[in-house]
C-alpha cells in the first residue's frame, strides 16, 4: 500500500541548531500515529512541516505521491489542534467551528449541517450558542477538535492537545479521541511526551531523540522489544544491566548464566539486558534466581513499587501486589521470556532483522 504521507530525508535547523536530522517517515491512511519524545526532540517540528507552518531545509514532504513541501497550509488537506486550542474568545461555539466554512463561502444550510454533525461527533450537541469563556478545558478541547474535523481533513494533527487537562479529564479524552478516530476513519498524528498516553492511544509510534527516529512500531512491539537503552528507559520503567551473550538462548549477567529467548548474537558479545519491573516476582530467598535485600517500598495504588539491592550492588525495581518488609532478604525470579537483549550500536534495521529471524525460527 502506498503511504498517504511521507517525509523523505528531511532535515531542519534553527539558528545552526539541528532539529531534524535526515528523517524518513511513512504514514498510511486511517491509523492513529504518535510522535513521542522528550522536549526538543523534533516532534512538533515534524507536525509543523506536515501542516505547512514550516518548510524543510532539505528533503521532501510528499502527500499522495506529490511533493507538498512548499505548499501553504490552506492548500493542504490537513487540520491542526493546537496545545492552547487557539479558539476565538469573542466568538461562540458555532462561530468558532463555522469560521473556516464561512471562508470557503459555503451556504448557510451547508454550514449549519456540518457544524451540527461536528458537534454531535464530539458530544457537544446543543452548545452552539455557548460562549467559549464559559466552557471547561475539556469542552474547549472538543470545540477545537470539532473546528478541525468540520473541514473534513485527510489528516488531523494534534500538538500535545491533552497536556493542559487534569489527569482524570485527560484519561477521558484519550478514550474519546481513540473512539473519534475509529468513527471518522481518518489519519491522526498526535504529538506527546507522555509515554502512557502514547501507548494507550496509538496504532503506531515514532520514538524520537535529538532529531532522529529511534524506533518505529506498534506500542506492544516497542514496549516489549525496545531497540536501545533510550527507548527502554523512555517507554515505561526498566531494569537495565550489562551482560554478555554466552550463546544462543543464554546470557550471562555479572557471572551468572540465564536462559533467554534471544539468538543470532555473536558469542561473548557485550549486551544490555532489559527486564520490566512487572515481569519480576518476589519469592523466598532460597527459591529465587538470585537473592536481594529490600531497600524501599512505595504504594502506587494498583501495585507496590519495591526497590531491591542484590549482592553485586545492582538496584532492581519490582512492581507487585505483594508487600515486602524493608531490610528483608528475598528471591527474584523472572521467566526467560522476560529477558530482552539489546546490542549497543545496533541500528533499528539490524534490530528488526534479528527480531524477524526469531519469528522465522518459531514458525519453522
Swiss-Prot record:
Gene responsible for this protein: potA
Organism: Staphylococcus aureus (strain NCTC 8325 / PS 47)
Domain ABC transporter: 5-235
Family: Belongs to the ABC transporter superfamily. Spermidine/putrescine importer (TC 3.A.1.11.1) family.
Domain of life: Bacteria
Enzyme's top EC category: translocase
Cellular component terms per the entry's GO annotation: ATP-binding cassette (ABC) transporter complex
Function: Part of the ABC transporter complex PotABCD involved in spermidine/putrescine import. Responsible for energy coupling to the transport system.
Listed name of the protein: Spermidine/putrescine import ATP-binding protein PotA
A Pfam family it matches: ABC_tran
Location of the protein in the cell: Cell membrane
Amino acid at each position: 500500500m502506498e503511504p498517504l504521507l511521507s517525509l523523505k530525508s528531511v532535515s531542519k535547523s534553527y539558528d545552526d541548531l539541528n532539529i531534524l536530522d535526515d528523517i524518513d517517515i511513512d504514514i498510511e491512511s486511517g491509523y492513529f500515529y504518535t510522535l513521542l519524545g522528550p522536549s526538543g526532540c523534533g516532534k512538533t517540528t515534524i507536525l509543523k512541516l506536515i501542516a505547512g507552518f514550516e518548510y524543510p531545509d532539505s528533503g521532501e514532504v510528499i502527500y499522495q505521491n506529490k511533493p507538498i513541501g512548499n505548499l501553504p497550509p490552506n492548500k493542504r488537506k490537513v487540520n491542526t489542534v493546537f496545545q492552547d486550542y487557539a479558539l476565538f474568545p469573542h466568538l461562540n461555539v458555532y462561530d468558532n467551528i463555522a469560521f473556516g466554512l464561512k471562508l470557503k463561502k459555503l451556504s448557510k444550510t451547508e454550514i449549519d449541517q456540518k457544524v451540527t454533525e461536528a458537534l454531535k461527533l464530539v458530544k457537544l450537541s446543543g452548545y452552539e450558542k455557548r460562549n467559549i469563556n464559559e466552557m471547561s478545558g475539556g469542552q474547549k478541547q472538543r470545540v477545537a477538535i470539532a473546528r478541525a474535523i468540520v473541514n473534513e481533513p485527510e489528516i488531523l494533527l494534534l500538538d500535545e492537545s491533552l497536556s493542559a487537562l487534569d489527569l482524570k479529564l485527560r484519561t477521558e479524552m484519550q478514550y474519546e479521541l481513540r473512539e473519534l478516530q475509529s468513527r471518522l476513519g481518518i489519519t491522526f498524528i498526535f504529538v506527546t511526551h507522555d509515554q502512557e498516553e502514547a501507548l494507550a492511544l496509538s496504532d503506531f509510534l515514532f520514538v524520537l531523540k535529538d532529531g532522529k527516529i529511534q524506533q518505529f512500531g506498534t506500542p506492544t512491539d516497542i514496549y516489549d522489544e525496545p531497540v536501545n537503552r533510550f527507548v527502554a528507559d523512555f517507554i515505561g520503567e526498566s531494569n537495565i544491566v550489562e551482560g554478555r551473550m554466552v550463546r544462543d538462548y543464554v546470557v550471562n549477567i555479572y557471572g551468572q548464566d540465564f536462559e533467554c529467548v534471544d539468538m543470532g548474537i555473536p558469542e561473548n558479545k557485550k549486551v544490555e539486558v532489559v527486564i520490566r519491573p512487572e515481569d519480576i516476582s518476589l519469592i523466598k530467598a532460597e527459591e529465587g534466581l538470585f537473592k536481594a535485600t529490600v531497600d524501599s517500598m512505595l504504594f502506587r495504588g494498583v501495585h507496590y513499587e519495591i526497590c531491591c539491592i542484590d549482592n553485586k550492588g545492582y538496584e532492581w525495581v519490582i512492581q507487585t501486589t505483594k508487600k515486602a518488609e524493608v531490610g528483608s532478604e528475598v528471591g527474584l525470579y523472572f521467566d526467560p521470556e522476560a529477558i530482552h537483549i539489546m546490542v549497543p550500536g545496533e541500528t533499528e534495521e539490524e534490530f528488526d532483522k534479528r527480531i524477524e529471524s526469531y519469528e522465522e525460527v518459531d514458525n519453522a
